[in-house]
Amino acid sequence: MFDIHNKPNSDGIVKGVSGNYEQFSQIINELVDNSISNYRAHEDEAGFLPVIDITVTEYDKTVEVFVKDNGTGLRNLDADLTLAGAGCAETVLNEHGFGLKTALSSVDSWTIYTCTKEDVKLGQHKKIFGPYSFEKFKGWLCEGECPDCFCPGTTVRFTCSKAMFQTLKPANRRAKDGFWALIKYLREELGYTYAKVLADREVAISVKGISGDSEDEKEVEPVMPRWEKRIKLPTVKTDLGGGVVEVDCEYGTIIPCRKNAKYYKANLTSSGVEIRVNGRVIECGLYSRIWNEAPHPSQNRFLAQVCITTDKASALPVTHSSKNGFRKGDEKLEALYSWIRKNIQKPEKNNQSLEHRLVACLAAKMEQQPGVLRVSMEEGAYTSIGSKSRIDLFVSAEEKAVIYEAKAHTTRAENLYQLMLYWDGCSMDGKPVDEAVLIAERHPSEVFMLLDQLNSQKDPTGRPYHFRVTTWTEEGVSLPATCA
């Protein structure tokens, strides 16, 4: 027999654990989770609205963040700061025992200030500095009230790089965003993650940004979908394999939310099934794993919200320690997917694009107009040279011929150049038009600027261009397309 010396290296473990959090929002969510968990576990002690105040201050190369709550304070620091110390877990929000330590390992520097009711009576508070360590890890007992935290309560202060802070921006934005835009994204992220918690007034969260002499503080509002059609199921009790849980579910078709940067945009990444546990989102954008097929673009406005309520962690599908998804292969997760398949109607595919349906509605209206002689969708252009180009809509009336280039939502300046090509193609084919219309839900300022410039020019035959922009609403076509 011989000894194996395998004492863990604390620096190596901390570096390994820190890689689990790649997003600034994961760090913030972990700290907010801990505060909410504390409130829920001790709600009988609170005679006030639980509050979480988040302050983000911009510096040259870093941001400094304070996450401050008015909970009970950390009563068992040994357990709270033990990696995998789930024995101190107060609710299912901190079941793993990794979250706080992972969050602290993912930032540049950190400090915890905490004060319990007992500390208040003794006129003291506690302070713990990073870096995290398994040996000779010490805290400081300080006299007086803590200026940086509620008493009782807990504050976590940390700094991180601006590169980490930039991870708040939506994935489709490649350029760096400014500080105030990132603050707005942070509010949206929190409002989405804790939407049902905030809507039920279980807690109030505020985010304050500070940059130089400028400050802006706002309470986080719940980010909720706007339903066009919705089916709400009654609350049901079911056993996923670890005990009975309550399931609330609603699903249907949502209206795209233009004011949001990321959520409920009715696109591929913000549609599908959204699963929450006790009001906190765990995973979203689920479709192919449930129905075993890729979603079709026509299903982008489909949303299903499934909220599981339980105080028993063992009754739930197993989550990642970062709580940003469920672990694949878990039997309780498969049972949940089966419940969803049985109780939620999978959205039907529509192989026609939204643009095609809108143009079809417009064409139907044009056919009813007096003096209209011919209405054609997918009209050929440059046919005289064998081109297969197609114009969205061609309308010939007694007085003039008009062509349409259609976009469902927003146009771009280059769409006008496409329309110009179609105008020239019609002239080449011997069927010159009198007006070319760009139609969409909305048009940015760049389109109007280019419109004026192009309308001052002439086509190759010497005829002046006549371009016009309009909206679906102005033409009496509703979004989403309904041809009633």
Spans of model-derived segments:
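Conserved beta-strand-loop-beta-strand hairpin that lines the nucleotide-binding pocket
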Residues: 36-91, 132-133
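Non-catalytic C-terminal interaction segments of nucleic acid-processing enzymes
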Residues: 461-484
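Bergerat-fold GHKL ATPase/HATPase_c domain
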Residues: 1-51, 77-79, 317-323, 330-338
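Active-site metal-binding core of divalent-cation-utilizing nuclease and nuclease-like domains
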Residues: 288, 370-399, 410-411, 476-479
